[in-house]
Amino acid sequence: HLFGALGSIKNLIDKIAAAKGVKTDDGRLIFDWIKTGDLISCELFDDYCDDVIWQLHNIQCILDPQRICIGGGVSENQIFIDGIKTAVKRFYQSLPIPFPQPEIVKCKYCNDANMVGAYLHYLRKNDER
């Protein structure tokens, strides 16, 4: 599977909605279920976070970052960030040998990062003229 499909929030939403027999694409509703401790939602969220950590670990093995920044709209949700951080701890504790654990942080601009980047690019391009 491609990471974009496996690690996407849409994938998480679809899995939880299907497991609960509900038709929705509302991520806020899904995270409300997780926040209130819904067993199905929490179990699938934990599985999702574990899948994401495998992908982040692969990136770590290739690029060796000390810090991994999580962005996008979902990064504004503390439940998501906490879930990823918990999965990181669980993953690295399960390894048979010590392995450096990257710091997981939320990106500063979250979902607005692309707009900030586009604006800075615009300013630089127009400053060159």
Predicted regions and their residues:
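ATP-binding/phosphotransfer module of carbohydrate and carboxylate kinases, centering on a glycine-rich
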Residues: 1-129
